Amino acid sequence: MKVTCVLGSPRANGNTAAVAQRFCNAAEKLGASVQIFVLNTLNYKGCQGCMACKTKMDKCVLQDDLTEVLESVREGDVLVMATPIYLWDVTSRLRAFIERTYSYFVPDFHTNPHPSRLSPGKKLVFIQTQGQANESLFADIFSRIEPIFKRYGFTDNHLLRVCGVRKPGDAESRGEAMRLAEETAQKVMAPTKGK
């Protein structure tokens, strides 16, 4: 199983990265091939609204550092998106990545019963960390993003949320957060029925 992990945090060694790394390490131990992309180290733009992916090509026409990431998702089985909450939402780097996934839709995706260019049955793990300990805050983030990926054909989707982590190291000191990351990896790596 091929896992593409997209880290949306500007802090390469922060809480978001720690939880994502724990998930990826557990998945590797279970046989996954893992590729990690730190978005903050890449040079790319968000969607330019040019519509070339609907009129000229079946991929995004922008050629930048995100090209490899988009192709890895296309070829992979599992997408891990990890983000801290910045100003009540995902980071701008992750948002720009999500915008660029628009190229996964076929031109007539509004009416086509098969709207995605991706192979169906991919799995999504959404890792959300936040400084706020109140779990009712920012609880809507995943519910806004998941429908996009369901339209792309992702069918086994998981939310891994860690609240109340501000300083680097906070997540690692919380055993339940690290256990949840490992347990989620076990669920994701479990054989899918019928395969």
Feature-to-residue mapping (PLM):
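Hydrophobic anchor at the start of a short beta-strand
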Residues: 34, 156-157
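Short, glycine-/small-residue-rich phosphate/pyrophosphate-handling segment
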Residues: 110-152
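N-terminal beta1-alpha1-beta2 submodule of the flavodoxin-like/Rossmannoid cofactor-binding fold
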Residues: 1-106, 111, 167-195
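Short, solvent-exposed amphipathic alpha-helices that sit
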Residues: 15-27, 140-153
